[in-house]
Amino acid sequence: MATPAFEHDHSDMGKRKITIDGEERPYWEQLFWAGMAVCSYLPSTVIPTGPNDEGLPIGVQIIGRQYGDLETIGLAKLLEAEGYAFTPPPGYE
């Protein structure tokens, strides 16, 4: 029997909304930013930057120039050294 790993929205994808800064936006708008790197074949590295004020995880996508894979990874390492890292939620330490 298939079971979900976590609770998620099964509604029509075109009708889904996500709240950003108190404003409801179409869910698919967020994929635009990831698509910029994917569609142009640019290297990208995604890193966690820690939780927000509500404890939800936040991350950033570092997009580099063509063939700049090691540059995006290097910047991610620098940010991690400055304290931008994954913080396990309570109970998952």
For each of these PLM feature ranges, what is it?
Residues 1-35, 39, 90-92:
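Serine-dependent amide/ester hydrolase catalytic core
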Residues 38-93:
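Structural helix-boundary/capping segments
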